[in-house]
Structures are given as C-alpha cells and as structure tokens.
C-alpha cells in the first residue's frame, strides 16, 4: 500500500481544488477535516454553511473553516452558473427557470464549478446514487475528447507481489458499462492506460481478456475482444497492449510462453480489461474475497475532468483516499494539457 502514500504525497505537493457536494454528510465532514489538516487538497463543501459548522462542532472537527463553504441557494456566482448551464443545455430545451432550480442542486453546482474553472474535480456518492452523480457530470463536464464512454477502474493490491506491478493490478471496467461494444472496450483500455499513469504512476501493460488466447476459441464474443484490441492499437499505437488473452496467459509467464509467446504483455500484464461489466465486477470481488486483495475504487475514467463516485457504504478513510486520487487525476490532466 506504499502506492497510496505516494498518491497522498503527490497530492500534497500540488494541492488541487476538489468539491464535495455532500458537504453536511458526517463521513464526508470527517474526511474533509483530515484532508484539510494534512493539506492534501483544497476543498469546497457545498451546503448551508451554518449547518456545516454546527455539525463539524458536534463532531469535534477543527479544520472545516479552512474549506470554502458554499451555500447552493445564495452565492455570488449563482447567476453566472445559471448562464453557463443555459449555454450548455439550451439546445436540449432547458429553460432559465429550470436552470435556476438545477444550480441549487449540489451535484449540478459542483460540476458547474469544474466547467467554469473554479474547481479541479468532484467527489460525491456517499448519500447519492451513481446515476445521480453521473448525470450532471455527463451533461456539464462531459467526456474526454475522443472518448464517448465513462468506465470504472479498481486498483487491486494483492498479497502475492509476483503478479502485475509488485502485486498491483488494475481492473476495468468493474463499475459502469454493462456490455461495451468493441469500440467502447477499446476506449476503456485507452482510458485505463491514462489512469495507470495518473493514479498508479506505472507504465501500463494492458491485457484484453477473453476465454480465448490468440484464436484458441472461435465465437462472436471473442471477435469483439479481437476487434477492440485492433481499435485500441489504432487509438494509441504507443501502448503495450495485446489480446485476446485468457487470464492465465496474461499473468503467468510459463503459461504465456506456451499460449502467446510473441505477445508484448502476456505473462506480465498489470492492467486487465474485462469484456463485460459482469466479468469485471465478479472478477474484482473474487480476487478481493478469495485472494485477500485490497480493492481501491472504482475510480471513474473517461471524463474531461475528474468526477468520482463513492460507494454509499464508503468509510471516512475511503473518502480520504478517493479525494487524493481525484487530485492525482487532476494533476495528470493538467500536465498532459501542458
């Protein structure tokens, strides 16, 4: 778990402005207090400022006033955000009256702050469903140019450090896209490469997984992975990426030497792209429960700016870590833009 400490160190070295739309929620407040005390990020907490301060006092938190406390119903940029939302959504039939209501929704307000350049990223989901977090993000922040789908990646820290990157594997998509097309699967692979560099600080070696290795089985499901591999290589020819590969061929060098001897990643993959959400979700939970791996995520990828969705069962520590991860995504995005 030294990687988590490295993620926190990088965040502290270049503090990013992260928005917490659920600013009055207890776990969120506790995580915010720790983040502010340690200087990991700069924060905006959305909610009634008096309610935030009162709750923080009840919880014995002493750093919340270091955050920007933003009342969604009354702040100096409200009209500017209404105008921005109208510019973005007028063609979809949004009226000024509707926009005025939406900008008071903390999830919309957080995304508008990002779009306006007033914040670098958002973290929500402790008390909101994934769909409610993603909807304003897709409408306002939108996806990365050249990427049409959002996906979710997990960092899996295995007790056995012979796999992946000293025991670190990245799994995608385990959270968002139920049955991606070949093109969407390729986009997930390219987005995952960006995440590997931005969050894990590793050079990705990507395996496109299937139940077949290099033509060992014939099926339309295999064809999808083969096509996704071709598209991903066209999108990002510099990537170390190969498919289709079975899991053992992707991770075990002895198996790789037999099944895919000419593959640039077989036997040493550190990023695993699953063909469906069903496979990815089951896969990460199997490794978590049966192999004793620690799963950190999902981290959303494919957005034009970082917006992350928490599990509603997230702990204070989960929120703390995800805020630092969100900051790392922002740092990497800014570096890429120059």
Stretch-by-stretch model annotation:
Residues 1-266, 271-338:
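Anion-binding alpha/beta catalytic cores of soluble intermediary-metabolism enzymes, centered on
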